[in-house]
Amino acid sequence: MAGPEPEPVSSAAATTPAPSAPVVLPKTSESDQLLKIRHSMSHVMAMAVQQLFPKARVTIGPWTETGFYYDFDNPDPFTEADLKAIKKGMIKIINKKLPLQRVEVSRNEAEEKIKAQNEPYKLEILQGLHEPITLYTLGEDWWDLCAGPHVDHTGQLNAKAFELESLAGAYWRGDETKAQLQRIYGTAWESPEQLAEHKRRKEEALRRDHRRIGKDLDLFSIEDEAGAGLVFWHPRGARIRLLIEEFWRQAHFEGGYELLYTPHVADISLWKTSGHLDFYAESMFGPMEVDEREYQLKPMNCPFHVLTYASKLRSYRELPIRWAELGTVYRYERPGVMHGLMRVRGFTQDDAHVFCLPEQISDEILKILDLTERILSAFDFSNYEINLSTRPEKSIGEDAVWDLATKGLIEALERKGWAYKIDEGGGAFYGPKIDLKIEDAIGRMWQCSTIQLDFNLPERFELDYIAADGSKQRPIMIHRAIFGSLERFFGIMTENYAGDYPFWLAPEQVRLLPVTDEVQPYAEQLLDQLTKAGVRATVDRSGDRLGKLIRTGEQMKIPVLAVIGAKEAEQNAVSLRSRRDGDLGVTAVSDLLSAAQMANSERAAGLELNR
């Protein structure tokens, strides 16, 4: 598989002392103290770096959800040995209990201080700031442009509760045409126990890395010859994807949706009308000329659904119209941000668009929330974090429509009984939205589902319907994606299960292990029975000893291993070993078939055998 390999799992998880009771790790965004600790740690690190490397120029150093980082412009690359020296320098600064003090200065004063320190990046940052300019001093000699907040002094930082974790490359302002910088990542917590728990979770995250699992289980690859960010689904991964798609289609049909299939390319004029060329061109692949017309790969499915709506006259009696598509889109992603299945250049979105009347908004949003819960819970995601983003200062659309749409979203969430936070002014310029994050098995939150109202595309494409009074009116358009993209969801799901997929979703559900050549015909006969019953089964024909057959099956995370010896063949039975339930003993073939079919129909995690 091309691209960077996941980090090796170290022995740190085993050597880090585990806390005696479960440690709840606070989130930076929800803990003022943790935010101050991490923000202050980034300053302490920058000070230590400049003490050790006087030629290093500082840029920015924010807090993150698990720690902090700082970007430096240094003539020589930092090394792992440098990180150790920097950490020692940080501990010295912490032990000195140096004060962190907020100072307001004029633009001219700030400019003079920056020039005196020869900090060109800070000078550029200053140009974008409004007076009064704030900076924070650390001790008497070191300072940084910053709005805060910070701890009162470095003695409030725990020298045993932080770590410098890694080095990475970065570009100034995230622009590949600008200076390449060196980023140092760190983590900081309130206590050593929290740090130990963070390390444990990090090791667990490495064990669950979907790139490693994808390679070990032969699920997918990304091939250099084809290009970066383009996914090759191998048979086992394709089987899982097919199961996801089949469930998704069934749920949508039952939810009152119809399916669409739309082209992968369109005339460039479509992207002009939709506004993508004005606002999204940097994320689109370049045009191609065919028969003297310019075409571009689609970055989104929305304009195609809009054209389908506009293909005939619509009546209010038809609304709501619900259309869904598993549509593959193509977006340019910079080389440095692509990551396994999580960030790719070609991916399949589970897009749906609802065209409805204004008074139908609340009911339609509630139906979408119900469908979202049904689909996500089938993959064992049941804890959600929900944000409702409202009208920004710059927006399009009438006040009454915005108010009605926002009220409809709130009403639907209230009717659903889901807790949510309001992000005032955080909506898109063309409509309010709901964002839903899912929590995985190790407590990480992943952005997943989006429900977005759109007042822009109906206006740009002049969509309408004939109202009850015979007038033409604009429909309300709701964008909606539950998975976000199949590729990204597949990666999240794989890490959530650590590759141990539930029985109904496993690419290979049962592996038959014939102990001798004499029982091989019986194994082949049983394979035929299982396959015809809709069970995904194989026979291990390697001829290896039983111990190795079992180890190989366990390494491939097969849910059920069926050992076949002479006794089992005589009894028309198998000896079952389950990853979930252990040794299940000798089981009649008829019972295995019934249990497997039941597990598939109920989308169950394992077999329920009648004993």
Curated annotation (Swiss-Prot):
Q: Name one GO biological process term.
A: threonyl-tRNA aminoacylation
Q: Which UniProt keywords apply?
A: Aminoacyl-tRNA synthetase, ATP-binding, Cytoplasm, Ligase, Metal-binding, Nucleotide-binding, Protein biosynthesis, RNA-binding, tRNA-binding, Zinc
- Classification via InterPro entries: aa-tRNA-synt_IIb, aa-tRNA-synth_II, aa-tRNA-synth_II/BPL/LPL, Anticodon-bd, Anticodon-bd_dom_sf, Thr-tRNA-ligase_IIa, Thr/Ala-tRNA-synth_IIc_edit, ThrRS_anticodon
Recorded GO terms, molecular function? Answer: ATP binding; metal ion binding; threonine-tRNA ligase activity; tRNA binding
The signal peptide annotation in the UniProt record is none
Q: Where is this region: Disordered?
A: 1-27
Q: How is the cofactor bound?
A: Binds 1 zinc ion per subunit.
Judged by the first EC level, this protein's enzyme class is ligase
Cell location: Cytoplasm
* Annotated GO CC locations: cytoplasm
Annotated residues that bind Zn(2+) are located at 302, 353, 479
Might you give the EC number(s) for this enzyme?
6.1.1.3
What is the similarity comment for this entry?
Belongs to the class-II aminoacyl-tRNA synthetase family.
Task performed by this protein: Catalyzes the attachment of threonine to tRNA(Thr) in a two-step reaction: L-threonine is first activated by ATP to form Thr-AMP and then transferred to the acceptor end of tRNA(Thr). Also edits incorrectly charged L-seryl-tRNA(Thr).
Task: Indicate what this protein is called per its UniProt record.
Answer: Threonine--tRNA ligase
